[in-house]
Amino acid sequence: MAFKDNAVELEERLVAINRVTKVVKGGRRLRFAALVVVGDRNGRVGFGTGKAQEVPEAIRKAVEDAKKNLIEVPMVGTTIPHEVLSEFGGAKVLLKPAVEGSGVAAGGAVRAVIELAGVADVTSKSLGSNTPINIVRATVEGLKQLKRAEEVAALRGISVSDLA
């Protein structure tokens, strides 16, 4: 679900900068890789990566990439509709809904994605690999898996009150 309108102001957050080298005949070629998360704090979030010889250029490319990959996050009040466990590579991320007022209990890369998505109350646990890019990808994958009660009821062909 990519959104093309740039009318909404998106907030950007730099998650990681990595210095990468390529060994060539004449020595080492140095470049920088940036990982950026963007979101409107109102249910839309995306991430992007960029690589360049200078840090600011890598960040600019990452922001451009992130704006092309926005997803819609279903929410129930200030939290997520249900618990979800998602994997990407060696990283696993568990997201659990939390009661209103409990805040975002998440670390590092997961916190950036959750906060910019606009989710105010959630508990999370990162398992396995802690590589920022894989953690961000696993978190976004988890947010994509979320479904509202109405969607689940429609898929099952029953009313929302019959779900419980």
From Swiss-Prot:
GO cellular component, one term: small ribosomal subunit
Taxonomy of the source species: Bacteria, Bacillati, Bacillota, Bacilli, Lactobacillales
PROSITE patterns hit by this protein: RIBOSOMAL_S5 (PS00585), S5_DSRBD (PS50881)
Species per Swiss-Prot/TrEMBL record: Streptococcus sanguinis (strain SK36)
Function, in words: With S4 and S12 plays an important role in translational accuracy. Located at the back of the 30S subunit body where it stabilizes the conformation of the head with respect to the body.
GO molecular function: rRNA binding; structural constituent of ribosome
Protein name: Small ribosomal subunit protein uS5
Pfam family, one: Ribosomal_S5
Quaternary context: Part of the 30S ribosomal subunit. Contacts proteins S4 and S8.
Recorded family membership: Belongs to the universal ribosomal protein uS5 family.
Keyword hit for Disulfide bond: no
Domain S5 DRBM: start-end pairs: 10-73
Gene3D superfamilies, A to Z: 3.30.160.20, 3.30.230.10
